[in-house]
């Protein structure tokens, strides 16, 4: 779907953005419906993780100014006209000149469920040596109706700088692959998206990217839900950090600020009408299976996935005597990383937990 659209000055078409394969593009669509891509790699405004975003503006003569990003730099102001693309700011040069960033590569693999093509990215530690063995970290995106992509991510680079190979996939339900792919989780979430993530892990193991004995996992929001689901389904990970999760669709639906969005979209009916299905799709239903040492993290002002969701997992693991700790971040909303000090705190706690439970 398109977004951020503006009429051209002659009213003969619109400029808009859309996502394709984890890349946000700027396009022009005329009144006959013919479209043309004008720029790519829009974004870089999401400080923490490699989500889409960014903005653009079009002058009367069709010159476009937009925020451009890549794996290697946050957003920079860039101008494009019919002849050339020019980057006109270098805001990050001073910051990055003394930093060595990890290389990022795109990977594609097949889903074991239905043979669909699944896209992901792998970030390597700086000065990566393929002859060495590195811990392998899965980072699950939120949404789930969103996408990761070929964009700068401070969190990914911090994990890579700490010596981790970081894998971040776009399983089914992600945007930028068409309507049908995005709707595969309708009344079925979480489900085969879990298999898509694990298939990516196995792809990386088969291709010598990951060591099957050095696996770790984290993710926030819907990514926290996926992380909790993964450790409830298998014991392959050395340790996990579940950030601002949905743990219980019944309590989440009835306590979150967006309580009105779930009936007939995520699951069918209201919780009191479809109690068993709400429970069956809740990661808390799997807490009896979890053997993985797990840190749970949440912002204390989070209205989207309230602290009570995180505490359900924490208390369940405490009752089962599984190694766990609860990190509550004061004054933090659902967007924990919006405050840079919280971003650093988040990453530092995650790395400390993995170090404690290698």
Placement of each model-derived feature along the sequence:
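Active-site-proximal cap/loop segments of hydrolase catalytic domains
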Residues: 168-358
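A flexible loop/linker signature enriched in serine peptidases of the S9 family
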Residues: 1-2, 17-27, 44-49, 68-76, ...
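Beta-propeller fold detector
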Residues: 36-42, 85-92
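Hydrophobic beta-strand positions in blades of beta-propellers and related beta-sheet-rich domains
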Residues: 5, 26-28, 56, 77, ...
């Amino acid at each position: 779907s398109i977004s951020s659209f503006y009429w051209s000055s002659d009213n003969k078409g619109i400029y808009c953005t859309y996502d394709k394969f984890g890349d946000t593009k700027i396009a022009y669509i005329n009144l006959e419906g013919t479209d043309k891509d004008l720029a790519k790699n829009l974004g870089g405004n999401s400080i923490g993780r490699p989500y889409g975003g960014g903005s653009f503006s079009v002058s009367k003569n069709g010159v476009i100014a937009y925020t451009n990003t890549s794996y290697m730099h946050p957003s920079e102001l860039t101008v494009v006209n019919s002849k050339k693309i020019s980057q006109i700011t270098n805001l990050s040069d001073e910051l990055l000149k003394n930093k060595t960033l990890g290389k990022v590569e795109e990977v594609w693999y097949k889903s074991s469920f239905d043979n669909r093509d699944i896209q992901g990215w792998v970030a390597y530690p700086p000065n990566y040596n393929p002859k060495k063995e590195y811990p392998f970290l899965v980072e699950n995106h939120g949404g789930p109706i969103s996408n990761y992509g070929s964009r700068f991510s401070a969190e990914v680079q911090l994990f890579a700088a700490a010596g981790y190979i970081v894998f971040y996939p776009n399983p089914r339900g992600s945007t930028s692959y068409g309507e049908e792919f995005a709707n595969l989780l309708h009344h079925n979430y979480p489900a085969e998206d879990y298999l898509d993530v694990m298939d990516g892990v196995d792809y990386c193991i088969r291709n010598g990217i990951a060591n099957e004995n050095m696996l770790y996992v984290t993710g926030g929001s819907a990514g926290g839900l996926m992380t909790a689901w993964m450790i409830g389904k298998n014991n392959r990970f050395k340790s996990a950090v579940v950030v601002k999760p949905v743990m219980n669709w019944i309590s989440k639906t009835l306590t979150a600020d967006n309580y009105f969005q779930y009936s007939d979209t995520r699951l069918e009916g209201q919780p009191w009408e479809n109690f068993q299905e709400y429970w069956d799709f809740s990661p808390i239903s799997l807490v009896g299976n979890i053997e993985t040492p797990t840190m749970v993290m949440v912002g204390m002002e989070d209205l989207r996935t309230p602290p009570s969701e995180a505490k359900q997992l924490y208390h369940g693991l405490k009752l089962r005597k599984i190694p766990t700790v609860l990190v509550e971040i004061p004054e933090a909303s659902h967007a924990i990383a919006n405050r840079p000090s919280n971003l650093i705190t988040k990453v530092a706690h995650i790395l400390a937990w993995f170090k404690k439970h290698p």
